[in-house]
Amino acid sequence: MSWQTYVDDHLMCDIDGQGQHLAAASIVGHDGSIWAQSASFPQLKPEEITGIMKDFDEPGHLAPTGLYIAGTKYMVIQGESGAVIRGKKGSGGITIKKTGQALVFGIYEEPVTPGQCNMVVERLGDYLIEQGM
């Protein structure tokens, strides 16, 4: 299965059969290389990936300044230390799950809820971890 298939079928999927979808999704290597992404996923800056990776190594690193994705600021909210970073911006937000080799990104807007985004992103992330990825 290609990485693009994971994004298309497992991240940009119909959530709970409700006809709702994430706004954007991506799978990115720890080095910042894009493995696959939805057409709507914003262009990440190298320093943003560096900051995200540092926050996984040193939880709380991004909290004072915020999480930036393509220059857009998200307020960092409760995640899972070293495993999941979550951010909020207005009625939407972002979930980032770290696997052994990749970062799984999901960006949502209403009517998708933070919990739905977390479920979709973390489910794929957990599967990739089980597969040694």
UniProtKB/Swiss-Prot annotation:
One of its GO terms (cellular component) is cell cortex. The keyword Acetylation does not apply. The keyword Cytoplasm applies. Keywords: Actin-binding, Allergen, Cytoplasm, Cytoskeleton. Its main location: cytoplasm. Pfam families: Profilin. Transmembrane segments: none annotated. GO terms for molecular function: actin monomer binding. PANTHER family: PROFILIN, PROFILIN-5. This is Profilin. It comes from Mercurialis annua (Annual mercury). The lineage of its organism: Eukaryota, Viridiplantae, Streptophyta, Embryophyta, Tracheophyta.
